[in-house]
């Protein structure tokens, strides 16, 4: 029987205060891995912005990833599961965000882009999460590709407004300024 441990990144493995993995956590994961336990990352982050696990990756402690809230899962270079958002729903979200004048992050299998970035994108993704700068693209360019996750910077009221146009999508919030879809 295979035994596995699953860990979130932000606030679980990586401290919100230090933006690092505590040495005691690294030692515990090394001990678990040495006993044959598999270690998986389970996160809302897309692969393109997992930039804070090098201390574990350098030690080959991570056996696989469940990213984008389960929409993209992989072990090494092998994709185990991928669930793209239907193109008509991606276009509906893009049109909604463009009309409202709010940013939206679009995540593909290997790339990430943002449309209409503002100070909130900078504050949350660059300053708080220490994500590298995300390329800015037009809504037309963002919707021309296969999208696995969208992060619109919309209120809960706006979420209710767009919800009928994205019926196959699951919506999650961990911060009031945006939703992971």
Segment roles from a protein language model:
Residues 102-103, 107-181:
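Conserved acidic, metal-coordinating active-site core of Asp-based
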């Amino acid at each position: 029987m295979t035994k596995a441990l699953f860990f979130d990144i932000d606030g679980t493995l990586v401290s919100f205060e230090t933006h690092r993995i505590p040495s005691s956590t690294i030692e515990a994961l090394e001990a678990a891995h040495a006993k044959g336990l598999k270690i998986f990352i389970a996160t809302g982050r897309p692969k393109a912005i997992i930039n804070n696990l090098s201390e574990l990756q350098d030690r080959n402690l991570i056996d696989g990833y469940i990213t984008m809230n389960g929409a993209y899962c992989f072990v090494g270079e092998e994709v185990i599961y991928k669930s793209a958002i239907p193109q008509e729903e991606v276009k509906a979200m893009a049109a909604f965000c463009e009309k409202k004048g709010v940013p939206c992050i679009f995540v593909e299998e290997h790339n990430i882009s943002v449309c209409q970035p503002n100070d909130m994108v900078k504050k949350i993704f660059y300053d708080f999460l220490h994500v590298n700068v995300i390329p800015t693209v037009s809504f037309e360019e963002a919707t021309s590709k296969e999208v696995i996750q969208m992060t619109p910077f919309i209120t809960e009221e706006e979420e209710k407004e767009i919800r009928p146009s994205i019926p196959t999508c699951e919506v999650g919030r961990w911060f009031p300024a945006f939703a992971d879809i």
